[in-house]
């Protein structure tokens, strides 16, 4: 189905080839500079005939709206911490929508809005030039054209893709055979990848959070809270017990612009539609990275759908509290977690897709799910309702039709706090997943941390009507179903899913799960002598630099599932007017003829442009 959008791609390529480069600094109308920060002073209206440079951290504030039309490309400079830059003392480009700002980013299929890197190509090479100091963007980009960018769109028409950008390698990992496959001997944790090439997109709202200023069961005053026996003083700019300052920013200078959270669940930060966020995740400091898309206290008045995060150095999408509802979300080939939830997130989600790398160094949890950063030792969980108690917002997101695919046997070898599972449940998390497909984690399917058991046993964690397969080496045994996390290695909570609730403290929370049926059709798995070491693994990328296909790897079709899944009538009915009734499991319509309709990822994602599928 790629060819159906080729004319749109040609138009997008032509526009991009003729685009000018515009830097969003203090010389741009409606933007001021204070120290190293950029702030809006009026509404910003971009045009798709230019490509825009984020020269640092740009804050949308002062009740301004940042308007981005379809087909626009926005590029962040690589910061000094990026492996693709030189110099010191400057941060990468990021766009931050503060609580008093709005974003209006409405792309369309065939002309998405793309956030990516402003890294320039080395002279005479297609690789990024790592010797450039980007601290003076006006000088760096003087005399440059869009064809000088590392990921220029000028080759789009030649490749015949339906996306506005060309196929790009997500990694510079070496290969050790003629097909470009990667083995353990060819990789290590120091190998550079096409990540950390700019910052990311951050949206901050005024919806409730459970930021964690809690000592036992008491909300702590004066911006101080106790966790794990330690008293933590917070920045003085926060004046509410459930306000926080978002990670990934230089906090002392940013001040209140970085705050999120508040009392308004219906708060609106604007609109994101058909937006692809690529190659970001700059490190500001140890444990202070920027996610591809960060949403702090974002309310359900915000519209977020058709959003992709591709090849980010940190998490793909992270929710810090808030109530925002999302659908048609894709996280592909990111280094850390795919969907991370923290601090009392209560939004709804549908059609979420995760596709992790099989390069052995990328991809942590598909879902790292935390409740709140609080000390629960004195909270009487059995007396707390499923939503909140005494002002404490407890997490309870509800997700329908997710497809999460880990890296399989060739997933991440660099373990994070134990094992890399499809899910980690901790910090008093509660929430629900229905009608989904979860497969191919390198380690166990679910790890329940020592501080995740209480709400699990209360029935506040729900997994119903889902398919699970290929998680850990033995794939389908109870012993391999759960990974270990934290000091408690004997609690077998995750077996409740494997046993469909039999013997569980809350059996109804884990009914109608299937753990012995491979959800994917044989065409989606590798087999044959040409690449026997990968037999049984999910097919990954089939695009290589020469423009040919890998016959042995083929392409993965996320709508192509086994007959057992396609014919399964056990579908849990939707529970909210937000959800779209869907008579199938997973993120893609498996009931329809897969050859006669597009995947919802086609025509705007890197997942599509890189030929991950054969469509």
Regions found by a protein language model. Give the residues of each.
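Gram-negative bacterial Sec-dependent N-terminal signal peptides
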Residues: 1-19
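Extracellular beta-rich repeat passengers
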Residues: 20-61, 66, 77-100, 112-314, ...
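Conserved H-D interstitial segment of serine endopeptidase catalytic domains
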Residues: 106
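Catalytic metal-binding/acid-base residues of hydrolase active sites
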Residues: 73
């Amino acid at each position: 189905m790629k060819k159906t959008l080729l004319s749109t791609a040609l138009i997008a390529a032509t526009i991009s080839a003729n685009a000018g480069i515009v830097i969003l600094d203090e010389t741009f109308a409606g933007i001021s500079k204070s120290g190293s920060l950029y702030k809006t002073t009026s509404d910003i209206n971009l045009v798709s005939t230019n490509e825009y440079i984020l020269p640092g951290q740009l804050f949308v504030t002062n009740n301004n709206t940042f308007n981005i039309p379809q087909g626009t490309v926005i590029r962040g400079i690589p910061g000094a911490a990026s492996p693709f830059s030189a110099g010191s003392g400057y941060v990468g480009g990021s766009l931050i929508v503060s609580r008093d700002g709005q974003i209006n980013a409405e792309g369309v299929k065939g002309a998405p809005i793309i956030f990516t890197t402003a890294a320039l190509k080395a002279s005479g090479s297609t690789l990024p030039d790592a010797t450039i100091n980007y601290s003076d963007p006006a000088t760096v980009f003087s005399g440059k054209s869009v064809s000088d960018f590392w990921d220029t769109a000028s080759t789009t028409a030649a490749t015949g893709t339906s996306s506005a950008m060309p196929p790009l390698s997500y990694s510079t990992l070496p290969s050790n055979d003629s097909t470009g496959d990667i083995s353990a001997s060819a990789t290590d944790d120091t190998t550079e990848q096409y990540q950390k090439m700019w910052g990311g997109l951050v949206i901050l709202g005024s919806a409730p959070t459970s930021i964690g200023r809690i000592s036992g069961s008491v909300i702590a005053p004066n911006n101080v809270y106790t966790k794990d026996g330690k008293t933590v003083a917070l920045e003085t700019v926060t004046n509410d017990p459930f306000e926080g300052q978002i990670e990934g920013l230089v906090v002392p200078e940013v001040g209140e612009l970085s705050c999120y959270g508040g009392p308004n669940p219906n708060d609106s930060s604007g609109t994101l539609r058909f937006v692809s966020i690529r190659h970001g995740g700059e490190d500001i400091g140890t444990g202070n990275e920027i996610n591809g898309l960060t949403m702090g206290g974002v309310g359900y008045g915000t519209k977020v759908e058709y959003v992709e995060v591709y090849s980010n150095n940190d998490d793909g999408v992270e929710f810090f509290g808030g109530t925002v509802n999302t659908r048609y979300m894709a996280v592909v080939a990111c280094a850390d977690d795919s969907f991370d939830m923290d601090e009392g997130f209560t939004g709804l989600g549908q059609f979420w897709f995760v596709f992790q790398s099989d390069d052995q160094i990328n991809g942590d949890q598909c879902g790292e799910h935390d409740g709140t950063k609080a000390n629960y030792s004195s909270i009487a969980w059995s007396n707390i309702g499923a939503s909140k108690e005494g002002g404490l917002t407890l997490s309870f997101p509800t997700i329908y039709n997710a497809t999460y695919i880990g890296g399989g046997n060739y997933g991440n070898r660099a373990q994070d706090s134990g094992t890399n599972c499809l899910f980690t449940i901790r910090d008093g998390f509660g929430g629900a997943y229905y009608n989904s497909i979860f497969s191919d984690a390198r380690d166990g399917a679910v790890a329940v941390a020592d501080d995740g058991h209480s709400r699990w046993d209360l029935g506040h964690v729900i997994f119903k009507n889902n398919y699970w397969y290929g998680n850990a080496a033995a794939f389908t045994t109870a012993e391999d179903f759960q990974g270990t996390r934290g000091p408690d290695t004997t609690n077998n909570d995750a077996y409740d899913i494997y046993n469909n609730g039999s013997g569980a403290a809350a059996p109804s929370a884990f009914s109608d799960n299937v753990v012995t049926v491979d959800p994917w059709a044989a065409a989606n798995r590798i087999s044959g002598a040409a690449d026997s070491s990968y037999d049984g693994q999910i097919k990954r990328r089939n695009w290589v630099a020469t423009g040919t296909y890998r016959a042995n790897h083929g392409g993965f079709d996320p709508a192509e599932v086994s007959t057992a899944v396609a014919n399964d009538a056990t579908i849990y009915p939707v529970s909210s007017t937000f959800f779209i009734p869907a008579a199938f499991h997973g993120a893609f319509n498996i009931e329809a003829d897969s050859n006669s309709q597009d995947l919802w990822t086609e025509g705007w994602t890197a997942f599509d442009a890189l030929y991950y599928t054969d469509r």
